[in-house]
Amino acid sequence: MPAAEGEKLSERAKLQKRLSRIRGQVEAMRRALDTDASCAKLLQQATACRGALDGFIAEVIEDHIRDRVVRASDHAAATAAAEELIEIVHSYLT
């Protein structure tokens, strides 16, 4: 198996773990809401969940830069990948 494929599988596993943690955090928020937890507790859990999701997004953006922009076969492909990334980041930030 080429190194790039092995790296992709490793990255996929890392992203799956991140998503599992996010799912657990969302479920914890749901349970807290069902048990009438305080607003402070809910906000604490929500910000932790948002931080985990931000980390997931950062990983995916990093992978996109490495796989599509840096490894582009030519300037046109790199430009297209960069434009796609700009749109994604813009929609994320606004």
Where are each of the predicted segments found?
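Solvent-exposed interaction patches of small proteins and small membrane subunits
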Residues: 1-94
